[in-house]
Amino acid sequence: MRSGVIAKKVGMTRIYNDAGEHVPVTVLQMENCQVVAQRTQEKNGYTAVQLGVGLAKVKNTSKAMRGHFATASVEPKAKVAEFRVSADNMIDVGAEITVEHFVAGQKVDVTGTTIGKGFQGVIKRHHMGGGRATHGNSVSHRTHGSTGQRQDPGKVFKGKKMAGHMGDTRVTTQNVEIVSTDADRGLILIRGAVPGSKGAWILVRDAAKVALPANAPKPAAIRAAVKNEAPATEGAE
């Protein structure tokens, strides 16, 4: 089981495939996604990696989190999340995961917080049909009608579809397709919609119900470290 990644939702657009068909895609961007900490079987009782993404101002980061990031020798992160991994897919602290972690055609599960809609009625929230427009109907055109039973059971069952708060919930969409990736700009293009508003952080994992492609990198696609070579000096004659 590989680690997932954290990406920011940029928005939606469309691209054209080789057959000339337009494909609606959601654009996700990875911003310096690094491993911040490890969870091991010996110390924590399970194996996982903690990832951090984006950049946060030091003044807006708590003292405890500043120390946490300093231990990993990484800059303060805007978003931190943990992903369960198998022992053979553990990633070193400080390593940066790139968008090449996923391959075109791969199925993934995406998790995000849906856009909040506030308090909504049953027609918008549950797609009910509403009441009659006329013929004796007054002020009950968009209501849900009766909600209870009679003396037995004498209550409204839990889970009854009624008006209430809509949206702003954590949702996972399974088996969405990776259309393509752009390593230079750090972009992931996913077919269809992804829960969340523009600018929201999205968790992207390998699909739980579909086999991992054989060409997917393991344990992850890691950006190679840039070596700062010292400038050559002229030897003394």
Swiss-Prot record:
* Keyword vocabulary terms for this entry: Methylation, Ribonucleoprotein, Ribosomal protein, RNA-binding, rRNA-binding
The terms describing its cellular component in GO are: cytosolic large ribosomal subunit
* The keyword Repressor belongs to this UniProt entry's keyword annotation: no
* One GO MF term: rRNA binding
HAMAP family tied to this protein: Ribosomal_uL3_B
- NCBIfam families in alphabetical order: L3_bact (TIGR03625)
Q: Which segments cross the bilayer?
A: none
Q: What is this protein called?
A: Large ribosomal subunit protein uL3
Assembly and interactions?
A: Part of the 50S ribosomal subunit. Forms a cluster with proteins L14 and L19.
PANTHER family per the record?
A: 50S RIBOSOMAL PROTEIN L3, LARGE RIBOSOMAL SUBUNIT PROTEIN UL3C
Role? One of the primary rRNA binding proteins, it binds directly near the 3'-end of the 23S rRNA, where it nucleates assembly of the 50S subunit.
Q: How is it modified after translation?
A: Methylated by PrmB.
**N5-methylglutamine is carried by which residues?**
151
Task: Tell me the GO BP annotations in alphabetical order.
Answer: translation
- Composition bias (Polar residues) maps to 135-150
Sequence similarity? Belongs to the universal ribosomal protein uL3 family.
Q: Which Pfam families match?
A: Ribosomal_L3 (PF00297)
What are the boundaries of the region Disordered?
A: 129-155
Source species: Mesorhizobium japonicum (strain LMG 29417 / CECT 9101 / MAFF 303099)
